[in-house]
């Protein structure tokens, strides 16, 4: 009973924290920032018009950047942005209302199953720059996943560019499921666990990838088919 009460308190605390973050914390990838400029550069130079954005947040970071770049440079394009958190998805729809059109889809859902998330017992927290208490992020991911549908089968089968900027613990499975469907992809937070397994995979399969641009915490790769 005590454990259930403790879990309930944590869930409630996380709920109100999410509401505040959705309203007050803009995304980190801004169009005028270093990562935003690289995204814009690679999209324009390579005419990347079919884009998947994993991790909408509240819409005011990478999603807004992608929308503006596409709208200002191409007559025809497609952007799909996915968010698993209902609170952030709702806020993104509100924040981006003035920019939305039929070529832009802000979707609520997930593209992997709960059993595709890592088991906390198999996570090397220290090597990944985490502490054991960060397992709470995984618990909250699972809680959110139970509330939304898997929309993977509703996605297009080919993309020109995918931005992998989703959950700390879902990112690798999402990457592994999708990287062969795209020409280019971006990795945000490359210094965190989010991209830890992804970068290991790229290093072990280096013939499949070409590093195009790299910043301290952001990289863009080309997929070699």
Language-model segments: which ranges?
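A short alpha-helical cap/connector motif
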Residues: 1-186, 190-225
């Amino acid at each position: 009973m005590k454990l259930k009460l403790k879990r309930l308190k944590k869930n409630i605390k996380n709920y109100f924290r999410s509401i505040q973050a959705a309203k007050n914390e803009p995304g980190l990838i801004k169009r005028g920032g270093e990562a935003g400029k690289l995204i814009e550069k690679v999209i324009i130079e390579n005419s990347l018009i079919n884009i998947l954005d994993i991790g909408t947040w509240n819409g005011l970071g990478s999603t807004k950047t992608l929308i503006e770049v596409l709208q200002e440079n191409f007559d025809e394009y497609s952007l799909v942005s996915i968010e698993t958190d209902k609170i952030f998805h709702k806020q993104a729809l509100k924040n981006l209302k003035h920019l939305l059109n039929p070529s832009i889809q802000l979707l609520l859902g997930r593209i992997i199953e709960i059993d595709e998330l890592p088991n906390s017992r198999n996570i090397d927290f220290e090597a990944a720059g985490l502490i054991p208490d960060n397992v709470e992020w995984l618990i909250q991911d699972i809680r959110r996943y139970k509330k939304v549908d898997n929309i993977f089968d509703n996605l297009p089968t080919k993309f020109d560019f995918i931005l992998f900027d989703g959950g700390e613990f879902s990112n690798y499975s999402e990457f592994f499921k999708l990287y062969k469907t795209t020409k280019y992809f971006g990795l945000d937070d490359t210094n965190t666990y989010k991209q830890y397994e992804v970068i290991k995979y790229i290093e072990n399969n280096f013939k499949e990838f070409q590093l195009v641009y790299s910043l301290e915490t952001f990289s863009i790769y080309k997929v070699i088919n």
